[in-house]
From Swiss-Prot:
Gas vesicles are hollow, gas filled proteinaceous nanostructures found in some microorganisms. During planktonic growth they allow positioning of the organism at a favorable depth for light or nutrient acquisition. GvpA forms the protein shell. Keywords: Gas vesicle. The keyword Nucleus does not apply. This is Gas vesicle protein A. The gene is gvpA. It comes from Dactylococcopsis salina (Myxobaktron salinum). Pfam families: Gas_vesicle (PF00741). GO terms for cellular component: gas vesicle; vesicle membrane. It comes from the Bacteria.
Length: 47
């Protein structure tokens, strides 16, 4: 079920709500300049 609210939520409230639903989010970001890899983004969601 998707919950919609009219009030704005902080990032902490959103993460708390997601964790209460039993969802695990793994997010990994890497940005390099001298090593040339400017952006790498990896995300995994486990329900």
């Amino acid at each position: 079920a998707v919950e919609k609210t009219n009030s704005s939520s902080s990032l902490g409230e959103v993460v708390d709500r997601i964790l209460d639903k039993g969802v695990v989010v793994d997010l990994w970001v890497r940005v390099s300049l001298v090593g040339i890899e400017l952006l790498a983004l990896e995300a995994r969601v486990v329900i």
